[in-house]
Amino acid sequence: MTDIIIIGGGPAGVSAALTAKHRNKTVKIISNSAEQSNLWKAKTVENYPGCPNVSGEELLSAFNKQIEDAGIELITGRALNALPMGETFSVSCGQDYYDCKAIILTVGVTQQSTYSGETEFLGKGVSYCATCDGMLYRGKKVAVIGLNEEAASEAELLRSIGCDVEFFDKNRAKKYEICGNDIVTALVADDTLYPVDGVFILRSTIAPNSFLPSLETKDGQIVVDSTMKTSIKGVFAAGDCTGRPYQIAVAVGQGNLAAISASAYIEGK
């Protein structure tokens, strides 16, 4: 059982991980590859103390080196959801599950909005992971809405296990609606109806309230108190996912505070 799992490996996540480690907590970070980060693409970062005119790539590489030197486990992948298990949580990443006592969300800005019917049919025909749920649709018709780099290969995986796949890349349609009664029966893409048994929505990131459905958000941002606690006991958040200002220094400070709060929560149980 890990003490703290951190979702996101940017400035807030790295700061939280190092702080938690220094407080003798076991830590895992689950994060997309650094290359998918908006910070990685920044040519120059001019306002982070001690690192004048550093590129985003250089800064993230330094963060990852510090994580490695501290012996903190970094799992590259997309965290799909977290299931409350009494006083602990089970976090899924691909086909793997990781148990922990507390979660810190440092997922950055989630720019994608959910589609009509997406939340309603999650687990009832809507999935975020072809590898995890593909076999449930063997011999059936599925739609894949591909919004990340791995989407095309995941669509091919579904075909290889016997699914009839209708693939939508990010340019094929602008508007989607998922339809059904108790389960998914169709996808409407730009007013064209496609009868399907399932819809795989493959994004680089997942909206926080899809990851934890009971999590309180406002305008897509996670609501936290002054100690970075969220509406769910044992879940904390830091960085851009909690709202403006979107600054590296702010994210680092919030990550530090979230780890202090998460550590105190664990110690007080």
Residue ranges of predicted features:
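A Rossmann-like FAD-binding core segment of flavoenzymes
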Residues: 38, 61, 67-85, 90-92, ...
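FAD-binding core/adjacent interface of flavoenzyme oxidoreductases
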Residues: 1-5, 74-140, 189, 200, ...
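Short, glycine/charged-enriched secondary-structure capping and boundary segments
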Residues: 20-21, 42-45, 117-121, 157-160, ...
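FAD-site-proximal beta/loop scaffold in flavoenzymes
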Residues: 120-136, 202-245, 249-250, 257-260, ...
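Short glycine-/acidic-enriched loop or helix-start segments at secondary-structure transitions
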Residues: 16, 39, 84, 114-116, ...
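Beta1-alpha1 glycine-rich phosphate/pyrophosphate-binding loop at the start
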Residues: 2-58, 140-172
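Glycine-rich nucleotide phosphate-binding loop and flanking beta-alpha elements
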Residues: 13, 110-111, 150-151, 206-207, ...
